[in-house]
Amino acid sequence: SFGKTIIGRMNQLGMIVDVSHIGETTFWDAINTTTKPVIASHSNAYSICPVTRNLKDDQIKAVGKNGGVICLNFFSGFVDSNFSKKDMAFRKTHSTEIDSLLATGIQREYAFTMISDKYKTESEAIKPTIEQLMQHFDHIVKLIGINHVGIGSDFDGINSAPQGLSTVLDYPNFTKALI
């Protein structure tokens, strides 16, 4: 009830309701409550990479019917369902070095970044390809049309993106994949 009140107020104020980072039940509550188009600011297709953060086909269709937009998330684990296993194996292989870095007091993610940089070829090889990201794009376009797909990247919150898409400077690679 409180959430529905908040969504109603957001609609009145012209605020966009973002359905990324919410559970499936909350997603449906939001879609059924809002009177304005929603955005999934950084989500992918569950049918291609079945992780709970990605949207199922009926959710994708609901966003399209609502007039909303789904913006692709570049996080490797939301693009390729095998990434997590490959990443864990990479971290296990280099656990001694990671542990040594952690013992110095640096933050865990920074230690992983340092090891990934040190073993660049190996760390890049476990990342998904741009083509795998494009499978999400193509799938969403087939379900709801090109006017409902955008780029969300999530560069400010991720530590791994597809090969060739490490920063915004790599967007031309994404553009080439679209052509």
Give the location of each predicted region.
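Histidine/acidic residue-rich metal-binding segments in metalloenzymes
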Residues: 1-18, 22-39, 52-68, 131-147
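Intrinsically disordered, low-complexity acidic Ser/Thr-rich regulatory segments
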Residues: 109-135
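Active-site loop ensemble at the mouth of alpha/beta enzyme cores that anchors a bound cofactor
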Residues: 53-55, 84-93
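Short acidic/histidine-rich active-site segments
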Residues: 72-74, 144-165
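The substrate-binding groove and active-site-proximal loops of carbohydrate-active enzymes
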Residues: 16, 46-51, 120-128
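Active-site beta-loop-alpha junctions enriched in small/polar residues
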Residues: 15, 20-27, 43-46, 73-77, ...
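Mid-to-C-terminal alpha-helical segments outside catalytic/metal-binding sites
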Residues: 139, 166-179
